[in-house]
């Protein structure tokens, strides 16, 4: 999808334990944009962090560019991951509905971000991934909804395999960021990369060229 006409850039990170499906979730979302490549079927574990982008027309707001960071869940990469916290405005906290430990660790991930950013700068969304694996599920939707409510965030279940709610998760987070920005709960700040106002002079375009969603040099 072209980034032409985007008013803001929102920097968003996906956090959660290793192997919960963050990479496949992100690549599936990016590949849902017209002209974007298909996601790899078996992505390798993320090394540190990778950046992707997708432009999005908000339901009740302007067109925005999402800068999406896929972070590694392995402990040896945690120091790298933490460096992104202070410059994100949105976080998808992802757990695997078939892996109870990944669900129990959600509060740890949430606390890490809160300790770095504070309570007023980040919009969270809880994502229960791999909802297609009902036979091996060990975390109920009710449990997840209760945790999300206790942490003050919304909850969405997703499945890349069934193409279930992938777009909804990212779109819901983006809409919530825009609403917070409109209401003044989140403010543009010099030197903070969470939300950036995009000026037309910063996006040169040639009539014969198009920009597609995909990995970016962020």
Curated annotation (Swiss-Prot):
Any Gene Ontology CC annotation: plasma membrane
EC number(s) given by UniProt: 3.6.5.2
Catalyzed chemical reaction(s): GTP + H2O = GDP + phosphate + H(+)
Lipidation (S-geranylgeranyl cysteine): 216, 218
Molecular function in Gene Ontology: GDP binding; GTP binding; GTPase activity
Compartment list: Membrane
Keyword annotations of the record: GTP-binding, Hydrolase, Lipoprotein, Magnesium, Membrane, Metal-binding, Nucleotide-binding, Prenylation
Coiled coil: none
Keyword Membrane recorded: yes
CC cofactor: Mg(2+)
Entry membrane topology: Lipid-anchor
Pfam annotation, one family: Ras
Ways its activity is controlled: Regulated by guanine nucleotide exchange factors (GEFs) which promote the exchange of bound GDP for free GTP. Regulated by GTPase activating proteins (GAPs) which increase the GTP hydrolysis activity. Inhibited by GDP dissociation inhibitors (GDIs).
Presence of keyword Coiled coil: no
Chain residues that bind Mg(2+): 23, 46, 70
Binding site for GTP: 19, 21-23, 46, 73, 130, 132, 160-161
Function: The small GTPases Rab are key regulators of intracellular membrane trafficking, from the formation of transport vesicles to their fusion with membranes. Rabs cycle between an inactive GDP-bound form and an active GTP-bound form that is able to recruit to membranes different sets of downstream effectors directly responsible for vesicle formation, movement, tethering and fusion. The physiological function of RAB42 remains undefined.
Family: Belongs to the small GTPase superfamily. Rab family.
Domain notes: Switch I, switch II and the interswitch regions are characteristic of Rab GTPases and mediate the interactions with Rab downstream effectors. The switch regions undergo conformational changes upon nucleotide binding which drive interaction with specific sets of effector proteins, with most effectors only binding to GTP-bound Rab.
PANTHER family noted in UniProt: DRAB11-RELATED
The protein's name: Ras-related protein Rab-42
Species of provenance: Homo sapiens
